[in-house]
Regions:
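Predominant activation on well-ordered alpha-helical scaffold segments within soluble catalytic domains
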Residues: 7-10, 30-41, 96, 132, ...
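Flexible, glycine/charged-enriched surface loops at secondary-structure junctions
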Residues: 42-57, 67, 102-113, 141-146, ...
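A short beta-alpha structural unit
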Residues: 54-65, 76-84, 109-128, 148, ...
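Short amphipathic alpha-helices in soluble, non-transmembrane regions
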Residues: 91-99
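Zn-dependent metallopeptidase/amidohydrolase metal-coordination segment
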Residues: 142-192
Length: 206
């Protein structure tokens, strides 16, 4: 299965002050953001979100972004993912409640926009079975995984049977400069894919 995802942009707006201004009475959007980030992670850790639910703050910008100034606004994104769309939407309701609660308690203005949304995609069990058999013929016992990243297959999944074949990244690292896969695993993945495609082309089509 490929996870559904929702991407939101949030802006907390407060009041800009000099860094030497008294702490009392500030309307500091950076402090609001920090509180939200902590509470969102705690919500997941304490079971308020499913264990396989992910929420990520991927972009963050302060304005005016000056070291001696309390920012006037903080803009950030929240990306959420889960394979089950109703679970995804319920999780977002809980996170959105936190977003609004922090803004209200700190006297911050709030802008919230959903930037994108995609539904979860169920991969083809038949294609997966072809992959499994091809891997086992190469002496590998494959693992069945859910995919958090969307992949191009998500765009095709509603029209044709799709499957995903993964080769392991060293230490599980992905989407970072340290991402790497051992050459022998790359070769094995290519062989398994070749075997699977030959099987599908030869009559194993789901």
């Amino acid at each position: 299965a490929i996870s559904g995802m929702r991407l939101h942009r949030i802006v907390y707006k407060g009041r800009s002050d000099h860094a030497a201004s008294p702490m009392q009475g500030r309307r500091d959007p950076a402090a609001g953001f920090a509180e939200l980030a902590f509470r969102m992670e705690r919500l997941w850790k304490e079971g308020g979100l499913p264990e396989d639910f992910s929420c990520t703050i991927g972009e963050l910008a302060c304005s005016p972004n000056v070291g001696i100034v309390v920012p006037e606004s903080v803009t950030f994104t929240i990306d959420i993912r889960h394979v089950d769309v109703p679970v995804l939407e319920e999780g977002w309701k809980r996170i959105e409640s936190l977003v609004r609660s922090v803004a209200e308690s700190r006297g911050l203005d709030l802008e919230l926009v959903r930037l994108s949304a995609s539904g979860g995609v169920r991969t083809s069990s038949e294609v997966g079975e072809v992959f499994r058999q091809a891997a086992e013929r190469r002496g590998v016992q494959p693992l069945l995984l859910k995919s958090g990243p969307a992949h191009d297959a998500a765009s095709l999944g509603g029209r044709v049977p799709v499957g995903l074949l993964f080769a392991p990244s060293i230490k599980g690292l992905s989407h970072c400069p340290q991402e790497a896969t051992a050459p022998e695993h790359l070769a094995l993945g290519a062989w398994v894919l070749e075997d699977a495609l030959r099987s599908l082309a030869g009559g194993g089509r789901p």
